[in-house]
Amino acid sequence: HKWYNDKENIAPIRAHLIDSIKHKPVFSSIDFLIVIQAIEGFCTRFRKETNLTTMLETLISEFSVIDKLKNDNINSRQVVDSRNYYSHFMNKSKKPYTLEGWELYNLTFKLRKLLICCILNFIGFGYDEINRLLNQSNNNLLQK
């Protein structure tokens, strides 16, 4: 199993995923950064893409058959600007697509579902199986 052979490479990504699904009383930009860092780490370690926009577009296209992601309309520009702003505290006027508050929370929610799909596929689940798992789940982290 690939996931077992790569357990050290997947460990930090798995840890970020686990951290992202733990209940927290308040959402913050750190929660967004944890998810986007895990997605970037996944792509850097297991995919060929090196540019965040390309990473996102590739993953969104790859998992477009997943029901829970079909209507998410993840905006790559919002993800990139938000990541750059919250990681480097750049001037917000230079990152006009930066999200905050409820919008950032919703974006993080969508990205977490994408990350879950990446991990499930990595450990060997096909798209039909991922669809079945997510559609049958009543976990509130997958319901939007």
Feature roles, as predicted:
Residues 1-144:
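Amphipathic, oligomerization/interface secondary-structure segments
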